């Protein structure tokens, strides 16, 4: 099985788990399914390196499908709250988590594409978003198996935390890109000025 196939299978499993179980309120089984397939995201890159087939295409595919998986997770939660969950506020928060996660990733990718290091990790990145959301969803799902009912509060709290953290991370990255771009432009202007030959005034005189 090729690393790309592992990436595709893993993403398909995450999308299926999120969009089948979460809209029905089956948070525990949805989390179990998603977690099993998320591990493929850790395996595919290592497989490619071990097999000596790492490529730009593989990196692009992995990053792109990560965005698809993230969208499915928060989209599934939004569908639950828009339907049987009957909570428009949390539906909006889940959609915000979906959108902000995509934009946070884009700001870093776009900054790097124009030659900036984007030297900031941010408060909450993809790994933190997934861990916080999936742990909370799984624990909330235990409430349907007779666990304490207060566990059901963990998912709403987690969504608010992820939303706030993603907003802070977005601001951090935008500020960093603005600073780095200003520094890069200033350095480029200084380099151009230093390369421009100085003009000496012409001497005039009478023969």
Regions found by a protein language model. Give the residues of each.
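Glycine-rich active-site/cofactor-binding loop and its immediate structural neighborhood
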Residues: 25-59
């Amino acid at each position: 099985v090729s690393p790309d196939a592992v990436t595709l299978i893993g993403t398909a499993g995450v999308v299926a788990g999120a969009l089948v179980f979460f809209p029905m309120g089956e948070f525990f089984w949805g989390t179990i399914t998603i977690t099993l397939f998320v591990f493929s995201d850790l395996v595919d890159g290592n497989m490619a390196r071990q097999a000596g087939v790492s490529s730009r295409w593989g990196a692009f595919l992995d990053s792109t499908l990560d965005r698809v998986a993230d969208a499915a997770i928060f989209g599934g939660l939004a569908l639950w709250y828009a339907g049987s969950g009957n909570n428009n506020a949390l539906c909006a928060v889940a959609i915000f988590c979906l959108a902000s996660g995509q934009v946070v990733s884009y700001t870093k990718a776009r900054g790097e594409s124009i030659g900036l290091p984007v030297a900031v990790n941010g408060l909450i990145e993809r790994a933190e978003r997934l861990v916080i959301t999936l742990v909370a969803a799984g624990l909330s799902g235990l409430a349907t198996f007779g666990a304490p009912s207060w566990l059901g509060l963990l998912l709403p709290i987690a969504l608010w935390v992820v939303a706030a953290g993603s907003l802070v991370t977005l601001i951090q990255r935008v500020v960093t890109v603005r600073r780095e771009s200003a520094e890069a432009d200033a350095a480029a202007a200084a380099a151009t000025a230093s390369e421009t030959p100085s003009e000496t005034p012409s001497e005039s005189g009478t023969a």
